[in-house]
Every structure is written in structure tokens, then in C-alpha cells.
Amino acid sequence: MSKLYVGSEVGQLRRVLLNRPERALTHLTPSNCHELLFDDVLLVEAAGKEHDAFADTLRQQGVEVLLLHDLMVDTLAVPEAKQWLLDVQISDFRYGPIFARDLRRYLSEMDNEHLATILLGGLAYSELPIQSASMLPRMKQPLDFVIEPLPNHLFTRDTSCWVYGGVSLNPMMKPARQRETNHLRAIYQWHPIFAGQDFIKYFGNEDLHYDNANIEGGDVLVIGKGAVLIGMSERTTPQGVENLAANLFKHGQAKEVIAIELPKHRSCMHLDTVMTHMDVDTFSVYPEIMRKDLHTWRLTPKGNGEMQVEALHNYLHAIERALGLNHLNIITTGGDSYEAEREQWNDANNVLTVKPGVVIGYERNVYTNEKYDKAGIEVLTIPGNELGRGRGGARCMSCPIERDDI
């Protein structure tokens, strides 16, 4: 079995991809944060220290931590990768042929450390030292971005997701995040950890416009035993689910996909903001999605490249059947209705399981953490006063690359 393999949500976590908050978050302001999909601006230094505590907690549990910036630097050292990234991101269509040529030349002469920082963190016109005959830069304001920052790269879960023996390079819903996928495409193609390794690229690795076939990793739970649970949120579409399912079945990597239609609002942005897998038979669930009237479907391979789509009445029963369990242990968000809503907003349900029954979550969610503890789940708490303002918890901020089956 390849080491590039994720067989579950709760098996021993062995290797994970994180992205420490740095330059991109310094470009967040009250006037642009909503366009960049943040509700607020963060104290970047404090957020970095909180993230370091998260990474250290993972290392203490024996998990190898890979950092996105480091992988980008290594990938840019491969000439073919550097050329591809500059060609795809600094195109004539985006910038016009004159400015694109000048900008590519400027960026190609940077050292790889600096270039990785710019590609991830953005570049304003006021920070650009070159002159160009193009009309475009003359029409821009100093604080306009030449290269938009990617603060949502903090949430490495979404851009790519490993599902059993392969990875989906996800076509993201929002323009503010779509460039992120190119970075992961380059890393998985050329970085020494991944180059030449035996793994499948299910979806999203082609130079295509994916139209409405969007999927994000926060909606994808690899619940094990050949089953995948996917939420259809405001960021993941039925078209995206069906395309990923078709490729999982084509490569024999999944037996079934359970798809749940989620409420379309900010607090329910992804499935993992309202539901995570904590132990073989235990899930954390926000009460709002306990409703039995949530539309649910079961997708299975039919042969000849076709799929069968079956409407279901209860997604929890579907999970029980997929995992061969008689009963699921459901832990709902803690506190009264007010406290539960506050803690869900602060990612109480968005925990990262490092091994069966042991999870990482924000220390601020005291009511929910207490419920987890009483149910026999060990919570390794991390600070999240700044990170939590980005509306993502430990699961959102991590992309497992190697994890055991259950």
C-alpha cells in the first residue's frame, strides 16, 4: 500500500499538510476581508503562534507535519514546475500580453523562497518595483493587488483531499480560492515527496474550466470501509459530487458515496463545520443537521461506468449500514441553545481526530469539550482566539496525506 493513502477519518494520523498564517493575512483589511471570504481581520503574529501550538500538538502525537510554504519552495526549485506555475497564474488573458511578459520576467528572477511568499501571500502594485509599458498597471491604485493574497490557504483541507489511494484536486467554488488548486497541482506533480509515487488523481488535475462541478475537501469525509460521506453545501455541488464519485468508482477506490444536502448558510459552510468523525462509532453533530428531512442519496457503481443513485430517508442510518454498525454514538454541540450556536460558530464540531477517540479542538469551546470528555473522547485543546476568527477549526486547517484504515 502506498504511504500516500487516507483510509478513514479516525485511524492513526501519520502525515498532514498545514499552512502557517503569514503574509496573506497581513493583506486582509476591513474593506477587503469579505471579498477574500473572511468575516474579520486577524492578529497575524498571534494567529501564527496559535498555529504553531496546533502543529506542535500534532508532532507530539507522532504526526509528521508538512508546511505548504516549504513544499512550494521545494517545488519551485524544479524548473518545469516553476515555469508551469508562472504560465498558468501570470497569463496573457489575466494581465494582457505586455504586462504578463514583464511580470513573469520579474517573478522568474526571484529566489524560490521569495516567489513562494508572493504566490501564497499576494503582491500589491505599491510593492512592485518594475515599470511596464502596459496600460493595466497605470490604471490601478497602489493598494490594488497585482497578485491576490490567498489567506484561505490556511484551510488546507479544502483545496485537495486524499480519499483512500488517491487525491482530488478540488475545483473551488469561490474565485478568491480558485488559484489555490494550482499550487497543489504543482506540488503533487513535481515535489520529491510526491513525484513518481503511486497514487491516483481522481478529479481536478486537468486544464479545464469545471463550470458547476465544484467540490471542497471540508465537505468530504472518508468514513472508511470503502464509504465516503459528502456534504452538498454552499461550496460543493451535486455535479462535483457525481464527478468525484464516478472517478472513485472507476478506479475501484470506493464502494459507495453518501451525499447529504446541507443548509446553505455561512455557519454550515462545509459538512465538517457541523459534523466530524471522532471514533469508529462516534460523530460530533450540530443539532440543526439532525433533522430527518435532509435530502440524502447513496451513489454506488453499476458497471460500465454508470452509477446508481438511490434516495435515502436517514443519513445516519446510511452511515451505520456503510460501517457495519448497529448504532452510532452522536455527541451534539454543548450548552443550551445559545451556547451551542456560539460554539458551533467557533468550530466546536470541527475537530481533527488523530487516532480513535482522540481529537484536537479549540480550548474556547468549553461546553462541547466537556460533552466530548464525558462521552470518552479525549480533547487535546489548542488556543484559537485568533485562528477561530477565520471560521475554521483543526479539521479545516489540516489535509491528511497518510492515515490508517479502521
Swiss-Prot record:
Keywords: Arginine metabolism, Cytoplasm, Hydrolase. It catalyses: L-arginine + H2O = L-citrulline + NH4(+). The active site is at 396 (amidino-cysteine intermediate). One of its GO terms (cellular component) is cytoplasm. The keyword Membrane does not apply. Pfam families: ADI. Disulfide bonds: none annotated. GO terms for biological process: arginine catabolic process to ornithine; arginine deiminase pathway. One of its GO terms (molecular function) is arginine deiminase activity. Its EC number is 3.5.3.6. It is found in: Cytoplasm. Pathway: Amino-acid degradation; L-arginine degradation via ADI pathway; carbamoyl phosphate from L-arginine: step 1/2. Belongs to the arginine deiminase family. NCBIfam families: arcA, PRK01388.1. HAMAP family: Arg_deiminase. This is Arginine deiminase. It comes from Vibrio vulnificus (strain CMCP6).
